[in-house]
Amino acid sequence: MLLSYNADLLPRVRMLGRINYTEPWIHFSRTVNEYVLYVIRDGNMYLQEDGIRYHLKAGDFFLLEPGRCHEGYQRATCNYYYAHFTHPAMAAVADEEAAMAQLAEKRRLSLISYNLDDEDPTDPVTFLPKQFHLPKNESNATLRTALDCYNAREEHY
């Protein structure tokens, strides 16, 4: 599944944190009115959203959507980051094949364009998969830094 979003617009992050459950735990049931991004550092998270089950492991990124009920379905230890945010131009994609064709065309236009032109041949709408995996060491330092900035809560952070 893909979500489209306007990359020219920044998300509004409401909450950011890290949780480390060292004893087996199961996610509580809830429906929120914002996106929630989970990034699994270690362990496992067994989560279902609107009845669809997902098994998340270290290195997995997973995006929960607003208005959909999510809850755990199996206990596990889990160490993860989370970010609650809203975005004014983010939505589920109805036709993934058309979205991929659109991305390919944007790439083609970008490659044949003259890079010193003021005019950008593409628009800022792009796509993000609901779930993807990165080797866990690639994202941990960046996420730690983001969490440190959030926790410092300096003026205009």
Report residues per predicted region.
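Conserved short histidine dyad/triad with adjacent acidic residue
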Residues: R14-V32, C69
